[in-house]
């Protein structure tokens, strides 16, 4: 890795259902887990952000299936203040209220290390599958970035929207998935093609080009509300 003590995960997604635990991002050694947790939430799912030495459990309920959302998870274990080692941004705003907190040790190396297997939209044994849409997924190795590196508020609507991140320095083990390809293999023409320049392409499991949609965070379609 460029620097295993500083990393950033950025995820753009829209949910379709919230009736079960669903995984957004997972590593095989539990260095990072981002999950919608249905357990214990009678009226909707909460979001949980884990590493293998820390966790942030949010109190908010996420029940909107009509809007795109953006999560940024910034990890910086070089910080002397424990609360600054994890930062979470949701739709451009830093989340500071959590039900449970636990922070990693200073100088801990957890994300982006060599040999780390990553699953997006599921976890290692292919359960807790995410039900919804994903438009962009990025991992930045060596920098702890805030949400403004990935999005901005629209001057007319005030809605948080993505910006062009192709100019970011992604680091040695960083990747940028735009899901624009059509193949299922881990190569430059596949759905999981890495366009960061690192060629860290992802293979696709249980998904084909026929499952792709033009509903994106810059072209949002109307959907039925399951709460009504």
Tell where the protein language model's regions lie, with residue ranges:
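Short hydrophobic/aromatic patches on beta-strands that form ligand-binding or substrate-lining surfaces
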Residues: 9-17, 71-73, 120, 134-139, ...
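Extracellular glycan-interaction patches encoded by glycine-rich segments
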Residues: 55-57, 110-134
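Short tryptophan-centered beta-strand motifs in secreted/extracellular beta-sheet-rich domains
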Residues: 66-77, 88
């Amino acid at each position: 890795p460029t620097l295993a003590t500083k990393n950033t995960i950025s995820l753009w997604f829209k949910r379709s259902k919230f009736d079960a635990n669903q995984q957004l991002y997972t590593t095989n050694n539990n260095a990072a887990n981002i999950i919608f947790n249905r357990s214990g939430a009678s009226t909707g799912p909460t979001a949980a952000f884990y590493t293998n030495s820390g966790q942030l459990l949010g109190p908010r309920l996420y029940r909107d299936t009509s809007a795109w959302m953006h999560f940024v998870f910034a990890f910086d274990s070089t910080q002397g203040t424990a609360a600054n080692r994890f930062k979470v941004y949701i739709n451009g705003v830093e989340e500071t209220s959590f039900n449970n907190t636990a922070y990693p040790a200073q100088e801990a190396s957890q994300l982006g290390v060599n040999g780390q297997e990553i699953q997006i939209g599921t976890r290692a044994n292919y359960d807790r599958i995410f039900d919804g849409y994903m438009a962009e997924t990025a991992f930045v190795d060596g920098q702890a970035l805030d949400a403004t590196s990935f999005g901005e508020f629209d001057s007319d609507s005030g809605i948080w929207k993505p910006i062009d991140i192709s100019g970011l320095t992604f680091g040695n083990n960083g990747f940028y998935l735009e899901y624009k390809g059509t193949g299922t293999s881990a190569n430059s023409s596949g759905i999981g093609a890495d366009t960061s320049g690192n060629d860290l392409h992802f293979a696709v499991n249980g998904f084909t080009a026929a499952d792709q949609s033009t509903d994106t965070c810059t072209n949002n379609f109307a959907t039925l509300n399951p709460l009504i």
